[in-house]
């Protein structure tokens, strides 16, 4: 999984050299941010169920057809609602992985790389997940550096889906 730290180490190693002072400064900066990222990941994890439920409701409110259309890819019945919540939870979980890793690697490798194919195959609209992530961003209750860290990865996911 790529992070700024693993990329710096990989580059230095492939060139047979020690980390440069710039690379070391990046590493120290990441260590300072790590605590905020871990706090954000813990808070999002602790509040995951309520955030996912609220995000799903935000999707249903903005896109009412998702609960009115019958079919495997809609939320007209409990099974569909459970699948929607599961998918939103997956996005949130990947964001927490980014917070722990300190980079977008988890989003890039586990989500964004195959999202177009997944959405096409299952007839899913990225706009549903954009709305869900916007809800999570607006309602996670984080502040300060933890908020900034979480929002940076939520924004990254939102932009990738937009």
Swiss-Prot record:
Heterodimer of an alpha and a beta chain, which further assembles into trimers. The trimers assemble into hexamers, although these were not seen in the crystallographic studies. Part of 2 PBS rod complexes, the conventional CpcG-PBS rod and a photosystem I-specific CpcL-PBS rod, both of which include ferredoxin--NADP reductase (petH). Keywords: Antenna complex, Bile pigment, Chromophore, Electron transport, Membrane, Photosynthesis, Phycobilisome, Thylakoid, Transport. Belongs to the phycobiliprotein family. (2R,3E)-phycocyanobilin binds at residue 84. It is a peripheral membrane protein. It comes from the Bacteria. Contains one covalently linked phycocyanobilin chromophore. It comes from Synechocystis sp. (strain ATCC 27184 / PCC 6803 / Kazusa). The keyword Transmembrane does not apply. NCBIfam families: phycocy_alpha. GO terms for biological process: photosynthesis. Its main location: membrane. The gene is cpcA. InterPro entries: Globin-like_sf, Phycobilisome_asu/bsu, Phycobilisome_asu/bsu_sf, Phycocyanin_a. It holds the Pfam family Phycobilisome. This is C-phycocyanin alpha subunit. The keyword Transmembrane does not apply. It is found in: Cellular thylakoid membrane.
């Amino acid at each position: 999984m790529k992070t700024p730290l693993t990329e710096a180490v990989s580059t230095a190693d492939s060139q047979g050299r020690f980390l440069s002072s710039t690379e070391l400064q990046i590493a120290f900066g990441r260590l300072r941010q790590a605590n905020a990222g871990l706090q954000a990941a813990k808070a999002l994890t602790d509040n995951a169920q309520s955030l996912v439920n609220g995000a799903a409701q935000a999707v249903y409110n903005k896109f009412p057809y998702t609960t009115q259309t019958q079919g495997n890819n809609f939320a007209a019945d409990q099974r569909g609602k459970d699948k929607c919540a599961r998918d939103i939870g997956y996005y949130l979980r990947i964001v927490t992985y980014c917070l722990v890793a300190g980079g977008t690697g988890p989003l890039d490798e586990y989500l964004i790389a195959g999202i177009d194919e997944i959405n096409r195959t299952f007839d899913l609209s990225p706009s549903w997940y954009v709305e869900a992530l916007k809800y999570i961003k607006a309602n996670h209750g984080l502040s300060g550096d933890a908020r900034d860290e979480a929002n940076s990865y939520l924004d990254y996911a939102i932009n990738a889906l937009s």
